[in-house]
Amino acid sequence: MVRALHDNRSTENTVKEILAAEGIAFCIEEKVDKASVDGYSYIEDGIPYIILTRRYDRIDNFAFALMHEVGHIYLHYLDGRRSDCKLSIPDYDNESAEEKEANAFAANALIPNEEWKNAPKVRLNPAMIQRKYTQWANEKGLNKWIVLGRISYETGMYKFRSDESRRIG
């Protein structure tokens, strides 16, 4: 599935097929007004569900949110650690141990930590960073926007020049 995310062609349909083959129900909902929810997951009657929202139409956000929810399914729900598996917005804590684990799972699934350790160490300006990391992503067969999304997530720098290839394919 990670390869399909990096290829970013017919991405939503491909992801749905891959998840269905694993017994995971998947759907995409339009953006939820006044809610900053990119996705959620739960298990009902033994069936895992992943729902993503169209909060952003960007492959980096889609890929991270998807793998974050896959992380919840495999790390927290299927191992029996959680049985309720319901999202409660008032109780939601982005800094909880489970959220941190799902974030780490997603980051490592999309760009393995061993690979990430060898990424360019450029921190000059957004244009230089974008150029160097795009070149590195191309050399590694990774989607440049997923790579730049990780840079944004880790550094808080979001000033990269966007183009049509950032949209979900």
Residue ranges of predicted features:
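Active-site hotspot residues in diverse enzymes, especially metal/ion-binding acidic/histidine motifs
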Residues: 1-169
